[in-house]
Amino acid sequence: MATPRLTPEQIAQVSGLVAKYVATQCERSASRAIPLSVPQRALMGGFFSPLLIDETRLLVLQGEWVANPDFYPMLRSLGFNNLPDQSAMAAITFCDVVVSHGPFSNGLLFHELVHVEQYRQLGIPRFSGLYVRGFLNGGSYGAIPLEVNAYTLGGRFEQNPANRFSVEDEVRRWIAEGRLQVCRWN
C-alpha cells in the first residue's frame, strides 16, 4: 500500500510530535545512561569528534522496551500501516542518548553515533522534519535519507575499521549537497 499523502500542515504537525517525542525520550533516558566505555571510545575515536564521544550517553535496556510514540494511533487512522516499531529496533538515538534493546555491537554503535552527529548538526526539530519527510517520500524506514547516510557510513566502517574518516565532515557534506532532503515533500 502506498504511503498516505499528508498536507503541509499535517507534515509540520507530525514533525513537531516527533521532535517532542525525541526530546522527551532523551530527557527520560539521560539519567540512566552512561558514557561510552574506554574500548568503545578507542574504537570510535578518529571517526567522531572527542566532544561527541564525551557527550554521548548509552543505555542498554534489560527486560523493557522503548514504547511507540503516543501519536501512532493518530497516524494509523490516517492510513499508515508500516510505522517503525520502536520495540523491534536494535537501538534508537534520542539526540545524544542512545537507547539499545541489547548489547551494542561495534557496527550498531557506529550507526547510532552517526545519528548523534546528525542531531548535532541539524538540531532536533530539523532532524525530525527530515526524518518524517524521508519516511513519507520513501514509504519505509530503509528509504529515509538520514538512515541511508548512517547505513552508508556504517558500511564503510564495517568494511575497514582501521580506515578512519570524519563522520562530522561526511554528514556536513551530505547536508550541503542536499542528500538528506527529499523533493516530493519539501
Predicted regions and their residues:
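Long, well-structured alpha-helical subdomains associated
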Residues: 160-186
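Active-site recognition of the HExxH zinc-binding catalytic motif
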Residues: 44, 107-119
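Active-site metal-coordination segments of metallo-dependent hydrolases
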Residues: 30-38, 138-151
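Non-catalytic architectural context of zinc metalloproteases
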Residues: 1-20, 24, 71-81, 85
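Auxiliary, metal-adjacent structural segments of Zn-dependent hydrolase domains
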Residues: 32-92, 170
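Post-HEXXH active-site segment of zinc metalloproteases
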Residues: 94, 103, 107, 119-148
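An active-site-proximal "capping" alpha-helix that borders the catalytic cofactor pocket
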Residues: 43-48, 146-158
